[in-house]
Amino acid sequence: TQIFDLAFISASCAIVVECGKLIAAGKSFDEIVEILPSIQSRIKVYYVLETLTYLIKGGRIGKVAGIVGELLKLKPIISINDEGTYYTYSKVRGRNKSIAKLAEIAHDALMKAKSKIWVLHGGALEDGKALYDTISKLPNISEINFGDISPVLGVHTGPGLLGIVIMKDN
């Protein structure tokens, strides 16, 4: 038995799929355990919320900061560092700009390396489909997928989450 901290909720399925591919390729348990950190290091996660309300209610951000953010229509683009800590990667004003920023982040990553992309949503199907359509036209995509976020993440963010998971190819 081996325990491996993925450090993020939303991209865990990507790692499970990669492990499945390694098993199919005949890799042993020990070889897969050895490879896991390199898989994790190739994954970046970015997401944006439609509202800050649920972060305020959950105590993830202060009430004053959240209310000011809502009034200014600030949309933080949230990412996760290598230690699993969530941080504000960027801030934009308005939903449309936040969706465009996610597409820009995907574009910039794909210009650096061929990658697999997952477009994820939590109660934002139409926005998610639009983001998927935009990103799917970008070069250097080895694989693109679309789906729902983990309910564990949705509990903290509420409806309206959009996210992208970028995994650089080997």
Q: What kind of feature is each model-predicted range?
A:
Residues 1, 7-170:
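Mixed-charge interfacial surface used for oligomerization/domain docking
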